[in-house]
Amino acid sequence: MLIDPNNGSPDYFVIFNYDLPIKHIISKNITLHPYHVKNPIAMTLLRDVMIAEVNFTDDEIPDEYRTGFFHTSQYFSRDQLEIFLACLQISNQPSNEKKNVFNFLEDSNNKPYEILGLYDAFPVGILSNSQPIFPFEDSTIDTVVNSSFYQFGTPFLYPISPTHISNSIEFYKKVQSILNKKNTKNEKETSWLLQNILLTYYKSKIDYTLVSISNSMEIIESMFGAPANITMSIRERVPKYLGYGSEKLSKILRTMYAIRSVNDHLKYTHQFSSNPWLHNFYDNKRFISSLTTILIEKWVDEIFNGKTRKEFRTSIIDDEKYSKK
């Protein structure tokens, strides 16, 4: 049901890939809401995203909506929508990103982001001067948005869903739990290691060029050892750890190492575009984002469950030649 049967209030609906054909099937049952950002130019980064309020029940959805309008969209509750809008805000304020991500790691109570304004109904294609239903003001939101942004990056490689937000909250809680454990020397070292890895991961999220590949490889190496002597080992150990096909992931990791050594951006672009297997499996941005996300989340789980860095690194080495490296 798109309408809560208890109070009749609508869910909000985030529409991705909003385009001209969609405008022709908007009806009185769907209300579009523009969201407000400080930098109008940045809106072009998200020009294919629109917020809608859906005012009919699931069994009333016409076929033309099911095949087009709803196919590339996600349902959000009011609370989830606020987090989503805050993620949009972070992606539209790149000048503040690095400063605020440091604040987030240093102070679990830091709340640096304002709630985005979501405006009332407006005719399709016409801007409105109506009053906002979410005020754009100096109030702030919880730092869970920061942890969400760690997972999504900017610009978004994938549409954010309510499930992503829920997972980010759990991820945030685990990270904070690890960072707050400082009773022993090992726990303190683990806390700092986690902080450094998250910052490197963050940098790889906001820059998906050659710099991103370098940052992503730094993350992998910090988890598995020093780069000088484990390059070949990583190619086997990472696929084994992730449970994927060793041959495919090893091939990708070899390519990533090769690309990182290339200083010429044009040559870097050519290497990726001229590799048909890589092009068909993942484009470079999506693969780097996916691989580092999976690795970071698994690593956080291991440490959260009490495993030390040394135990983490040695537990997945079941080949004698790698254990000697």
PLM features: residue spans?
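Short, solvent-exposed segments of well-ordered alpha helices
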Residues: 188, 203-210, 247-254, 279-283
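Charged, non-catalytic interaction/linker regions at domain boundaries
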Residues: 1-211, 290-324
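Extended, amphipathic alpha-helical scaffolds
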Residues: 218-225, 237-240, 261-262, 304-325
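Histidine-centered, metal-coordinating catalytic motifs and their short helical/loop contexts
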Residues: 247-276
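Flexible secondary-structure boundary motifs
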Residues: 212-250
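Acidic, Ser/Thr/Gly/Pro-rich intrinsically disordered interaction regions
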Residues: 160-171, 268-286, 290
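Charged, amphipathic alpha-helical oligomerization/scaffolding segments
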Residues: 203, 255-262, 287, 291
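Charged/polar positions within long, soluble alpha-helices
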Residues: 228, 261-269, 297-304
